């Protein structure tokens, strides 16, 4: 076993079909002895229609800032902007270094990164990209199987509930659409009569 523990947080937010990147998992690793992030293995649930998944990506998200020490965050910043006009569909390249990508994945996804760790807190995240024709009724379930550091399996501590189901969504408006920096969209409701 690897000597350092990897803390894992699975998101509970909608997967936007039109996005190239959607945060699926966050990873926080205090590299006291580990020097290399070798791979992360992920399993999709048996009910997942894998033909809807375009890509699964692993990103390096940087290190912990001194002012955040002790806050036990899972990300130093938001990796995908919700307010930068024209830049709300993909990871912000300044804060996201792509380490691995698997196109049209199978049920077991192996993200081989061989990424050199910095001493201290390192952040990684897994992104999910769906195909444009994916139905809004599609549901995704996934589970972390293992993380390897320096060729050894790491101890992983999950900081989120089990059996999370990720649902699809569409961003009705994005910053920059029709030349507008932002939009106010009133809440949409359905009555008992439809």
Mark where each language-model region is:
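Beta-sheet-dominated interaction scaffolds and their linkers
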Residues: 1-35
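Beta-strand-rich interaction surfaces with strong enrichment in secreted/lumenal proteins
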Residues: 13-15, 26-27, 95-101, 111-116, ...
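Asp-box/BNR beta-propeller blade signature and adjacent active/binding-site loops
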Residues: 21, 33-35, 97, 105-107, ...
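A short beta-strand element within beta-rich, extracytoplasmic domains
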Residues: 35-47
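Predominantly extracellular/luminal cell-surface or secreted proteins
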Residues: 43-45, 58-63, 125
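Short coil-to-beta strand junction motifs in C2/discoidin
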Residues: 48-57, 139-140
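Extracellular adhesion/glycan-binding regions together with long Ser/Thr-
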Residues: 69-120
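Short glycine/proline/serine/threonine-rich loop/turn segments at secondary-structure transition edges
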Residues: 118-120, 132-143
């Amino acid at each position: 076993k690897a000597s350092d523990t990897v803390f894992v947080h699975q998101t509970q937010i909608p997967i936007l079909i039109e996005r190239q990147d959607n945060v699926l998992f966050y990873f926080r690793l205090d590299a006291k002895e580990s020097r290399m992030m070798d791979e992360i293995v992920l399993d999709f649930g048996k009910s997942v229609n894998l033909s809807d998944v375009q890509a699964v990506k692993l990103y390096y998200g940087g290190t912990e800032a001194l002012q955040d020490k002790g806050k036990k965050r899972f990300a130093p910043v938001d990796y995908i902007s919700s307010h930068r006009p024209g830049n709300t569909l993909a990871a912000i390249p300044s804060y996201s270094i792509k380490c691995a990508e698997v196109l049209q994945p199978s049920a077991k996804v192996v993200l081989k990164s061989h990424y050199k760790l910095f001493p201290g807190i390192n952040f990684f995240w897994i992104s999910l990209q769906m195909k444009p024709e994916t139905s809004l009724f599609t549901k995704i379930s996934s589970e972390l199987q293992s993380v390897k550091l320096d060729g050894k399996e790491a101890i992983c501590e999950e900081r989120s509930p089990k059996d999370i189901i990720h649902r699809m969504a569409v961003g009705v408006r994005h910053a920059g659409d029709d030349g507008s920096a932002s939009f106010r969209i009133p809440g949409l409701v359905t009555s008992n009569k439809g």
